[in-house]
Amino acid sequence: MKRLLPLIATLFAIACCAAQNLRKVPLADPFILLYDGVYYAYGTGAGSGIEVWTSRDLSTWERAKGNARDGLALHRTDVWGEKWFWAPEVYRLNDKFYMYFTAEEHICVATSDSPLGPFVQETRQPMIADEKCIDNTLFIDDDGRAYMYFDRFNDGLNIWVVELEDDCTTLKKETMRPCIHVSQEWEKVWPRVNEGCFVIRRNGTYYMTYSANSYESPFYGIGCATADSPLGPWTKYDRNPLLQNPGELVGVGHSALFRDKAGNLKIVFHGHKSKGAIHPREMYITDVRFRSVEGGCRMEIDPGYSPALIAE
């Protein structure tokens, strides 16, 4: 046994070094779609559009060849905007795939027949043409009504909501209203930012995850607010943030919730490359749970995250 110990130690050291050298998926503002047994990850990263990655187990990922130009899922030649393609989310609606994304600090939507694209706009224009907005996300309630949440540039970045028409692209402008703004001490590091939200409904309560502080800050983190209606009013948890600087990670945020093949609720988010470098931001996944508390249930994010690794 004593002779085996040095060998075991050597093998363990080799395994640790190998794990540290595995490359992580370089996606910021990530979103995961599960469709037909395959996970599709979209995010900020490509300069001329939106790339897509695929996985069958959420652990190892491959850069997929998208059907748009240059192997992307969405290319700038098919949509409004020339640059700054950020924060895409993809949903299957009406037998098509809808991608909600930001281009040149304007919120847009494009459609495709495949999760690999090409995502195209028949009419090349943003959803709100006369105002800069970012980070649009879709929520469809149990009654079929669709809502879009997004960030507006007023007194920093604040999160707003608007109901959509049945086509999930046209705004009912009279329903537009604010949801949350910078209000808690942990959010006031720099600058004034509440952004990158995502909304789900559970047992009649609406849960909104969001990120606060600049994405460049090591104190970027994820908070939660709840409401009894998708239009609010929203109340932030008094014990926010739910996730900030877990383990060795810094700059964690811009998350999205999804369910895996077993139906478990998970959250995907990005973190900085390292404590000394922001870019490229990298994708991580962890579990989401609900704990019974006085007056209801509280969302919790497991700090035991897993990196999304590139299959070699």
Regions found by a protein language model. Give the residues of each.
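Carbohydrate-active catalytic/glycan-binding domains of CAZyme proteins
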Residues: 18-312
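Hydrophobic h-region of N-terminal signal peptides that target proteins for export
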Residues: 10-18
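Sec-dependent signal peptide recognition
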Residues: 2-10
